[in-house]
């Protein structure tokens, strides 16, 4: 405790006694470079103060990127820091939504400060330790054509916004990760060459890499001691000491284990099959074969099917998941033998169809089977099937409906169904080829291996292995030893190895790219929204997305894939959806996925009604009614924002000049202004879709799409809007989650509840959430270590739980 008090005292003394700012911790952006020289759209003007330079940013086409040399010098001071402040003085044009500064690497925003006049918000974007971009939004209007002194101060997980020397907001946020690559770009007054253009004047723009940097603007403000970053650093030091102690304990335990194991050593031979480890003499079933691990070798025998003598009313038939036929109940229908579960369609000349299914040895008619969807193909390309009433188009993918073929068998689409066919190098174990076994070309003499080689059977094929001291001439013959033939190379599994004099070279196979040591599958374009390129030109999409490149969000709402409760409406989100309570209802902070938790709001009891004093509020389901007591002559007036509005009165909202409200018998009805684009006096700020000017159009972030004024779209978990040539984007609104542990699935934007704390993305900074490792050492939340006795198992104290996983790059 005495050490901690001394540590804190030293920190406080250093923070309070400091006078001025050390140039080593100040990034004076307008001192390092002048945007008024060589950059169109920027001019030097008179600022709020006369002793420093101020710059006006105007125009719709400019590219103010800090030169690489100056950017590298500035960013070096910020790299790896978790305590800094962004400070400046500005005067921003009304309704402008622009970026003050942005540090980018590729598509990732490492640090960005922007001010939205359209949404009246200040937004800070930064990268976190989870390699995700976190956005913190402060409802505040800077774009009012007035001078403001702004400071955003970050101290580890503590974020504070100061405006005009007033502390406006104070938040707890994830700790920023300022791992800034050398080739990062630094933009001023814009996000990139085409978006987020700030319009107005900026002065004294600087980043102060020091505790409580806001005091350079407002020296009279109170300072806290120690800062959150000081405390965070102390916790990190304790974690390092814990790790040293754990590593020492691990080495000691390992030494003790080795000493105790010197007397006797027995290594049991095991078998590895499909990433599964089997012990000696352990047996298992693999497809249609019974296998046993014997002395480290897998020995398999084909399952022999016994002859069947099926009783009356049954017939031999395959059952899903079995190798041998079994006696199954059957039905006789139209001279056909059907087994349990099979269907038969009766197509009448009149066009009617009836579907019957064999159940309990009796054919039962299946109701509703004749309700068929419309087909998109010509009638000549429509095929009538025997097991269903609905026709299908020629080329229909039956395999996608039900693939009963095993891993060594391919599903093949036919005109009226699907069948299984063994892959090359395999032969059927069942009559229908649903299960297939590998052909041992070596044992059966069906190989082409020549002298100096040994035939080795492989799944579906064989290979010729050179004898010791020989190298490969081609696939079937050898002459002496080289790296490629012996496997003593570092070529990727999707690369070809070429022997050279004194070495070898690797070249990726067609459809893959890389240096040969590492080869990755190529997909045209790239797999979007969390999709992965599984093989050349094949993207595997995560749930909620579709398309060749996973570029299409599945709108579960419009496609009717979900059914919200009666008092909720479906809201689509990228990769997901949620059910939102309708007007007049709320979930009372008890969230349910389908909106079942939505309950009526009692506007009368909660004081949300607008009834005048001479009427009586009567609650309704999803609303309310203002009723006049019997015998009274009521005015029908409304109470809105503590003001009396007369019955039939119409007014414009003070906070939104684009919304019109009216009083109707005690109830206030508000709506957006009706846009009549034919009216020459229409307000294009309220009706941006009525702005026909080309200068009011916006370019999409990818540079390939053009939007008109008023258009909205979703990009990178943000909802964007084009307004008179300016793009403003803000984070999507996510539904609340009532749980302890959440994660954001890849490709999605909003957190979902998970029961496993190890799957959760967020790591609590609460130091009381500790863990006990395998040595009995207490670990703080967020600390990580290599598990004792392993080299590749990484453990982490996460939300009070020990979570371990194997690092595949370590194996």
Swiss-Prot record:
| Signal peptide limits | 1-18
A single GO CC term for this protein reads: extracellular region
Residues bound to Ca(2+) are: 438-439, 441, 457-458, 461, 553-554, 556, 572-573, 576, 600-601, 603, 619-620, 623
Q: Which residues are glycosylated?
A: 222, 290, 295, 515, 613, 633
UniProt keyword terms in alphabetical order: Calcium, Disulfide bond, EGF-like domain, Glycoprotein, Metal-binding, Repeat, Secreted, Signal
Give an example GO molecular function: calcium ion binding
* InterPro entries for this protein: ConA-like_dom_sf, EGF-like_Ca-bd_dom, EGF-like_dom, EGF-type_Asp/Asn_hydroxyl_site, EGF_Ca-bd_CS, EGF_dom, Growth_fac_rcpt_cys_sf, Laminin_G
Q: Where is the EGF-like domain positioned along the sequence?
A: 395-437, 438-479, 480-520, 521-551, 553-592, 600-635
Q: Alphabetically, which GO biological process terms does the record hold?
A: fertilization
Q: Where in the cell is it found?
A: Secreted
Coiled coil stretches, renumbered:
none
Q: Which CDD domains match?
A: EGF_CA, LamG
Q: Where is the Laminin G-like domain?
A: 54-225
Q: Which Gene3D superfamilies match?
A: 2.60.120.200, 6.20.200.20, Complement Module, domain 1 (2.10.70.10), Laminin (2.10.25.10)
Spell out the Pfam families in the cross-references: EGF_3, EGF_CA, Laminin_G_2, VWC
Q: Where is the VWFC domain?
A: 269-328, 636-691, 696-754
SS bonds (residue pairs): 399-411, 405-420, 422-436, 442-455, 449-464, 466-478, 484-497, 491-506, 508-519, 523-533, 527-539, 541-550, 557-570, 564-579, 581-598, 604-617, 611-626, 628-634
Its annotated function is as follows:
May regulate neuronal differentiation, polarization and axon guidance.
Listed under subunit, the entry gives: Homotrimer.
Name this polypeptide is given: Protein kinase C-binding protein NELL2a
Q: Which gene encodes it?
A: nell2a
């Amino acid at each position: 405790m005495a050490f901690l008090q001394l540590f804190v005292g030293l920190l406080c003394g250093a923070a309070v006694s400091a006078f001025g700012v050390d140039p080593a911790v100040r990034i004076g952006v307008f001192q390092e470079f002048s945007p008024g020289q060589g950059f169109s759209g920027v001019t030097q003007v008179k600022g709020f103060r006369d002793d420093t330079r101020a710059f006006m940013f105007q125009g719709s086409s400019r590219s103010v990127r800090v030169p690489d040399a100056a950017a590298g010098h500035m960013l070096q001071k910020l790299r790896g820091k978790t305590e800094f402040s962004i400070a400046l003085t500005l005067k921003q044009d009304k309704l402008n939504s622009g970026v003050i500064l942005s540090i980018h690497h590729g598509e990732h925003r490492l640090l960005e400060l922007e001010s939205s006049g359209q949404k009246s918000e200040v937004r800070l974007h930064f990268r976190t330790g989870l390699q995700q971009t976190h956005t913190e939004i402060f409802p505040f209007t800077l774009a009012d054509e007035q001078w403001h002194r702004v400071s955003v101060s970050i101290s580890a997980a503590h974020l504070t916004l100061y405006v005009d020397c007033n502390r406006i907001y104070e938040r707890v946020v994830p700790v920023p990760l300022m791992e800034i690559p050398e080739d990062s770009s630094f933009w001023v007054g814009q996000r990139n060459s085409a978006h987020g253009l700030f319009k107005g004047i900026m002065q004294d723009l600087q980043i102060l890499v020091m505790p409580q940097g806001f005091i350079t603007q407002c020296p009279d403000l109170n300072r806290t001691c120690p800062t959150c970053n000081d405390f965070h650093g102390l916790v990190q030091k304790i974690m390092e000491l814990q790790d040293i102690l754990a590593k020492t304990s691990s080495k000691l335990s390992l030494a003790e284990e080795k000493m105790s194991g010197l007397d006797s050593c027995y290594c049991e031979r095991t078998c590895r099959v499909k990433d599964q480890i089997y012990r000696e003499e352990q047996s298992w079933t693999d497809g249609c074969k019974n296998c046993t691990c014997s002395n480290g070798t897998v020995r398999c025998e084909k399952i022999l099917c016994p002859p069947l003598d099926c009783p009356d009313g049954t017939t031999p038939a395959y059952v899903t998941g079995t190798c041998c036929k079994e006696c199954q109940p059957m039905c006789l229908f139209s001279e056909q033998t059907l087994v349990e579960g099979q269907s038969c369609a009766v197509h009448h000349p009149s066009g009617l169809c009836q579907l019957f299914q064999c159940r309990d040895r009796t054919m039962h008619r299946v109701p509703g089977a004749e309700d068929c969807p419309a087909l998109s193909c010509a009638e000549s390309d429509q095929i009538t099937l025997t097991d269903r009433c609905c026709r299908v188009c020629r080329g229909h993918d039956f395999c996608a409906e039900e693939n009963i073929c095993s891993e060594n068998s391919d599903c093949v689409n036919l005109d009226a169904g699907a069948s299984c066919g063994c892959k090359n190098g395999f032969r059927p174990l069942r009559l229908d080829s649903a299960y297939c076994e590998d052909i041992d070309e070596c044992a059966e003499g069906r190989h082409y291996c020549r002298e100096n080689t040994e035939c080795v059977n492989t799944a579906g094929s064989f290979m010729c292995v050179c004898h010791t001291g020989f190298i490969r001439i081609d696939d079937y013959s050898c002459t002496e030893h080289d790296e490629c033939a012996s496997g003593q190379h570092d070529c990727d599994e999707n690369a070809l190895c070429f022997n050279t004099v004194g070495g070898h070279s690797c070249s990726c196979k067609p459809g893959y790219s890389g240096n040969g040591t590492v080869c990755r599958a190529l997909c045209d374009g790239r797999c979007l929204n969390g999709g992965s390129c599984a093989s050349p030109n094949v993207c595997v999409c995560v749930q909620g997305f579709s398309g060749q490149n996973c570029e299409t969000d599945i709108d579960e709402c419009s496609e009717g894939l979900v059914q919200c409760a009666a008092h909720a409406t479906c809201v689509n989100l990228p990769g997901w959806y949620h059910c939102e309570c309708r007007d007049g209802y709320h979930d009372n902070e008890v969230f349910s996925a389908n909106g079942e938790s939505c309950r009526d709001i009692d506007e009368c009891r909660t004081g949300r009604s607008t009834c005048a004093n001479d009427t009586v509020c009567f609650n309704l389901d999803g609303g309310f009614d203002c009723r006049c007591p019997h015998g009274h002559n009521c005015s029908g007036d409304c109470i809105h924002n503590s003001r009396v509005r007369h019955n039939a009165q119409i007014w414009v909202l003070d906070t939104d000049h684009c919304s019109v409200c009216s009083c109707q018998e005690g109830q206030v009805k508000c709506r957006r202004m009706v846009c009549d684009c034919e009216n020459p006096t229409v307000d294009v700020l309220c009706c941006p879709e009525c702005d026909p000017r080309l200068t009011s159009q916006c370019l999409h972030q990818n540079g390939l799409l053009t939007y008109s004024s008023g258009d909205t779209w979703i990009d990178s978990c943000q909802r964007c809007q084009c307004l008179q040539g300016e793009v403003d984007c803000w984070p999507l609104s996510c539904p609340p989650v009532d749980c302890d542990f959440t994660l954001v699935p890849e490709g999605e934007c909003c957190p979902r509840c998970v029961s496993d704390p190890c799957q959760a993305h967020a790591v609590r900074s609460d130091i009381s959430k500790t863990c006990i490792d395998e040595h009995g050492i207490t670990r703080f939340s967020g600390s990580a270590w290599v598990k004792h006795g392993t080299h590749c198992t990484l453990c982490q104290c996460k939300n009070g739980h020990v979570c371990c996983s194997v690092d595949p790059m370590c194996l």
